[in-house]
Amino acid sequence: MKKLFTFLLIVSAVFFLKQNVAAQKVYSCDSKYDADVKVYVADSKYDADLCVYKCSSQYDAEGNEGLWFFVDSKYDAKKKIYFVDSKYDADLIIYFVDSKYDAGWRTNSKKQLMY
């Protein structure tokens, strides 16, 4: 019984971690009606809710800390986003940074949008 419990615990942990790793694979939609989150790109990081670094590999896009990997298919994405022209139409305001060390949340109350 103890071995079964340990096995189920490990399988659950692996499943949970796999879900978190995939959390930042995003797809850019052509329509706001297909999107999970409407995003506006700010000119300054001080105006942003989230500073985003575009990863070159899906394996670098971990957790919910602003490391995004853009996928080619909406079926591979955890979140579908649509870029809007006005910050007033956006659910989330982001700023693209040049280093993954600069990525992260500036407004923690919006974190649930990307889970």
What role is predicted for each listed range?
Residues 4-16:
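Sec-dependent N-terminal signal peptides
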